[in-house]
Design a protein with these regions (language model features):
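Mid-domain Rossmann-like dinucleotide-binding core that forms the NAD(H)/NADP(H) cofactor-binding site
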Residues: 133-212, 216
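C-terminal capping/lid region of NAD(P)-dependent oxidoreductase domains
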Residues: 224, 254, 260-261, 265, ...
């Protein structure tokens, strides 16, 4: 049996593993499809994550250095790549009552030929409805962050909405914003293929930020008013600067991205100072979230799963390219790390 592992920073390989016996609360799944996470996972893959040498302390709500003798947060050679898997249950533990051998399921897990997942009181292990799309299923994770970004920005009927960065999260945010009643939805991304997909799924306009004054173009498209809401998923300083420039007075920026360090030159004066901008940092898995207790992570997940399985969201075009598991190391290094412009969310077939 093989699994996809980061053996060194920016190096992926298939590594042999021995299957272990499942515990009473677990199921073993033979994986048929999967997908990695193109955002935070690739930061880890590049050894650029703060979690390597630091840990986020829940009591202090801040990062703190790991003790010198403590394991690092990411250990290359052990770091398994992948985020979501779809497959069939081939073994059930004795305490498992909600699943059976043969069930087709989707869950969080790494890209490996088999995965073992807790199946007792685990709502995150989802049964696949008959005839449902695996491509929609592996978008379960990005859909949650897209939906929280839209909700935290309080998108309302008639709003002018901009989505910056048209990866999987941004593409799903486009669909959600349009279906929430936004009158104008604008996508921002330099990659023409991503813009084409966004237009097919709800974007009224798409802007290429390279060599353009995106903020002014947003104002032009909205009759000089600017955007009521800008959902920022790219994590780049220039994107946030443009968002502050294109935002309507009193508008909201929903900051979904796990940002890169900002270089010198980012300016919170200028339009940010004059336009009463509000920036909300949106993260679906940080609880309690802004609408707690009515909305919890569980409710977000259950809503996203329903929207993915009933076809309200369409992620077929987002899973591109699709590679075989045998070619997944090369695919991961090319499409996820080295040339992310060639993909939106890479799919893997087994």
């Amino acid at each position: 049996m093989k699994k996809l592992v980061a053996t060194a920073p920016r190096v992926a390989a298939l590594v042999e593993y021995e299957e272990r016996a499942i515990l009473a609360n677990e199921v073993k799944i033979r994986v048929r499809f999967g997908a990695p996470k193109h955002g935070t996972e690739v930061v880890d893959f590049r050894a650029a994550s703060p979690f390597i040498d630091e840990d986020f302390n829940g009591e202090w709500q801040m990062f703190s250095p790991r003790p010198a003798n403590a394991p690092r947060g990411i250990e290359f050679g052990k770091f398994q790549l992948g985020n979501m898997v779809v497959g069939d249950i081939i073994e059930c533990g004795s305490d498992v009552n909600d699943y059976a051998v043969g069930d087709s399921v989707c869950g969080y897990g790494p890209l490996s030929e088999t995965v073992i997942i807790n199946a007792v009181n685990n709502y995150k292990l989802r049964k696949m409805p008959q005839g449902s799309s695996w491509k929609n299923a592996v978008c379960y994770d990005p859909a949650q962050f897209a939906m929280s970004g839209v909700r935290d920005a309080n998108v309302r009927v008639g709003d002018f909405v901009v989505v910056v960065g048209l990866g999987a999260i941004g593409q799903i945010a486009i669909q959600l914003a349009k279906r929430a009643g936004a009158s104008v939805v604008i996508g921002v991304d330099p990659i023409a293929h991503r813009c084409d997909i966004a237009r097919r799924h709800g974007a009224d306009f798409c802007l290429n930020p390279i060599g353009a004054d995106v903020g002014k173009e947003i104002k032009t498209l909205t009759g000089k008013q600017g955007a009521d809401v800008i959902i920022e998923t790219s994590g780049y300083a220039d994107a946030l600067q443009s968002a502050l420039r294109g935002l309507a007075y009193g508008g909201t920026i929903s900051y979904v991205a796990f940002a890169k360090p900002f270089a010198e030159g980012f300016n919170l004066g200028r339009e940010a100072h004059f336009n009463n901008a509000k920036i909300v940092f949106s993260r679906a898995c940080s609880e309690p979230n802004p609408d707690y207790p009515r909305w919890s992570r569980k409710r977000i997940e259950e809503t996203c799963w329903e929207l993915l399985m009933n076809g309200y969201l369409n992620c077929e075009d987002l899973i591109d390219p699709v590679v075989t598991f045998a070619n997944s190391p090369e695919g991961y290094m090319q499409y996820v790390d080295q040339h992310p412009e060639q993909s939106i969310k890479m799919g893997v077939t087994f």
